Amino acid sequence: MNAWNTIYDQFNPIAFSLGGIEVHWYGLAYACAIVIAFYMALRMIQKDPERFPIERKEFESYFLWAELGIVLGARIGYVLIYEPNSSYYLTHFWQIFNPFDRHGNFVGIRGMSYHGGLVGFLIASYLYSRKDLKKLLIYLDLIAISLPLGYVFGRIGNFLNQELVGRVVPKDSHLGQIIGIMVDNQLRYPSQLIEAFLEGVIVFLMVLWAKKHTKTHGLLIVVYGLGYSLMRFIAEFYREPDSQMGVYFLNLSMGQILSLFMVVVSLGILLYATRHSKKIKENQ
C-alpha cells in the first residue's frame, strides 16, 4: 500500500463553504473546463480564420447557447437514462434543476450525462445556426478542437469529488496495485483519471492531427465523435458500471452502448459534411 492508494483519506471533496453553501472541487473544476474551452476556441479563431471564419461576438453568443444546451441535455439525459426514479421527474419536471432538497437544504444539482449533454449541444447548435446552416459545421468543428482539454478538468473534478469510481483492481494486476485508489475498503482503478487521459488528452491529439491534415468543414467533429466513442468504450472497462444500471448485452455498460450510438451519429454527420461542406481555402 502506497500513499497514492489512500489519497482519498487526505482531502475533502468540499473545497470551501460560502454562506453555508458547500462549494465542491467538482464545481470549480467544471468552471475551469468552461473557461479553458472558451479561450481555446478564441485562440483557434484567431490562429486559423480560414477554417473558423467567426467573429468574437458571434462566437460568444453561440457559446452561451452551446453551454446551455450541454447543461440542460446532460441533466435531462441523466434523469432519463440513469435515474432509477425517473418517473417522478416526468411528473415533477422542475425538480430536475432544483438545487435544494425537500427540507430546503442546498445540495446542488447532481447527476450529469455526457451523452445527454452531447444531444443538448447538437440541438442547441442547430437552433442557433438554423438561419445560416452553412456555419453549423464550422461551429461544431470549433467545439471539437476546444472541448477535449476542458474535458480533462471535468474528469479531474469527478476524481476529486470521489465519484464515478473505477472497477476493483484484480489481485494479479501489478500496475493496478500501484495506481489503484482505496474506495470503501477496496482497491479500484482511478477510472476518472484514465478517462481524463483517454477521452481528453488523446482525443485532443486526434482532433489536432485532423485539423492539420483535413481541409473540409465538419470533419473535426466527426473525428472527435469517433475518437471519443473509442476512448470511452475502452475506459468503461476500468469504470464501475452505475449500480442501478449494471451491464447489458455482451456485458457492455450503458456508457459503451451509448458510445456505439455516438458512432452512428458521427457517421451521419460525416455523410452530411461530405455532401454539404466546402473545401477550406489554404492560408495565404
Swiss-Prot record:
Transmembrane parts of this sequence: 18-38, 62-82, 106-126, 136-156, 190-210, 218-238, 252-272
A molecular-function term among this protein's GO annotations: phosphatidylglycerol-prolipoprotein diacylglyceryl transferase activity
UniProt-listed Enzyme Commission number(s): 2.5.1.145
One GO BP: lipoprotein biosynthetic process
Domain of life: Bacteria
One cellular-component annotation, GO: plasma membrane
Keywords: Cell inner membrane, Cell membrane, Membrane, Transferase, Transmembrane, Transmembrane helix
Topology of the protein relative to the lipid bilayer: Multi-pass membrane protein
Binding site for a 1,2-diacyl-sn-glycero-3-phospho-(1'-sn-glycerol): 155
Main localisation: membrane
Pathway assignment: Protein modification; lipoprotein biosynthesis (diacylglyceryl transfer)
Pfam families, alphabetized: LGT (PF01790)
Protein's cellular compartments: Cell inner membrane
Statement: the UniProt record of this protein carries the keyword RNA-binding: no
UniProt-listed PROSITE patterns: LGT
Listed InterPro entries: Lgt
Keyword Transferase: yes
Function description: Catalyzes the transfer of the diacylglyceryl group from phosphatidylglycerol to the sulfhydryl group of the N-terminal cysteine of a prolipoprotein, the first step in the formation of mature lipoproteins.
Family: Belongs to the Lgt family.
NCBIfam families: lgt
Protein name: Phosphatidylglycerol--prolipoprotein diacylglyceryl transferase
Species: Helicobacter pylori (strain G27)
Gene designation per UniProt: lgt
